[in-house]
Amino acid sequence: MQKEKTILFLHGFYASGQCVPAVALREAFEGKAHVLTPDLPLHPHDAIRLIREICDKEKPDVLVGNSCGSFYAQMISPIVGIPALLGNPHFKMSDFLRERIGSHQYKSPRTDGKQDFTIGEYLISEFEELEAHQFDCCNIYNKDRVWGLFGEEDTLAHFEPLFLKHYMNSHHFPGGHTPTAEQFKTWYCPLIEKLLLDYPIAEDRVRYFQHFKGNKYKLIASAFDSETLERMVVYQALYGDHKYWVRPEKMFFETIERDGKRFSRFQEIDWEE
């Protein structure tokens, strides 16, 4: 029996898991897929931590983001190894927030009932820190697995040129920054279905990588350093004695530079034992 697909939706900065796009997504895939629409924390490191925890537990088959949620999805997709649809991605959240310093309210209900929040310099600096490294794990393998969807009437985010510096598939829809329910079902959902069809995730979720020096490895698990709680990667050599190795997750997935050339330290590959 085929396992039910799981979709993880990441909402925009002012939104929640009950925003219009989230509700439309749940309605569109009712009976067809398991849809997760969590409330994301205000602070970006907390949001990313929660998303990773959900990915560890629920093992989604695709990430779907809108605005700030797309900012998160782009960074997480190559690390967890699943395709992503980035709706109106906002890759410069610090600029967006700097013009809005002060007290605000979320535009859709939050499950904890807390609707008020404040934008301040510390929050802006957190986003700036992430923005400086947001494409560090972007790789050749993922170039056609992360799709962008851009509203032709979007007045807030204009990042299609930046998106196309890293990815190949750009789509458009006749709408603004936040799609209506009808627009979401008409334009987002067919692309989500196509991503699920074109890039199915292996049931065992085994992934293979090639080091830039040529050796190949199997990714075994994501783990935590018991002292620092830093994310680590456990991987096994597919040569020699098939030894197991551990290194910080960032050092495994990041892009490095050698002799003026930039490339992934470990490049994901299609490979069968």
Model regions and ranges:
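Gly/Ala-rich beta-loop-alpha elbow adjacent to hydrolase catalytic centers
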Residues: 64-73
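Short hydrophobic segments within beta-strands
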Residues: 9-13, 64, 149-151
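Residue in the alpha/beta-hydrolase core beta-strand immediately N-terminal to the catalytic nucleophile
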Residues: 61-64, 83-85
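Active-site catalytic motif of lipid deacylating hydrolases and related acyltransferases
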Residues: 2-57, 177, 201-202
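The alpha/beta-hydrolase serine catalytic core
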Residues: 83-198
